[in-house]
């Protein structure tokens, strides 16, 4: 019985431990960089709440997946809330059928770098850069309504 249970364990060709099933995890690093002149408060539903990003700073969140790096779509599936300067401007964003600029739920609004760690662990870095154009777009949408 023990031989059957251990059959999936082992090392890869380089002698690195591959774990129980032989598949390494995948990692994603999500980075939201604030290059605007405004303080941003950000919430990603079911991930984190009300994290502040000051001008010139970044917020980093790491997510571990099974075999492949977690996707942006999976990470933000329940939406994201952005508030500028604790004021009325910002928004609650979701993925929709229509791709939108200044929506942090769409991959096309990110810089994406894919690589491998130690040659076999999938790694993906997702970077969204907030600029004053994000704030201007929020002002153009008008004040947020009470949720």
Model features per residue range: what roles?
Residues 5-8:
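C-terminal motif of bacterial Sec signal peptides marking the signal peptidase cleavage site
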Residues 10-31, 39-68, 72-147:
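Intrinsically disordered, low-complexity segments enriched in small/polar residues
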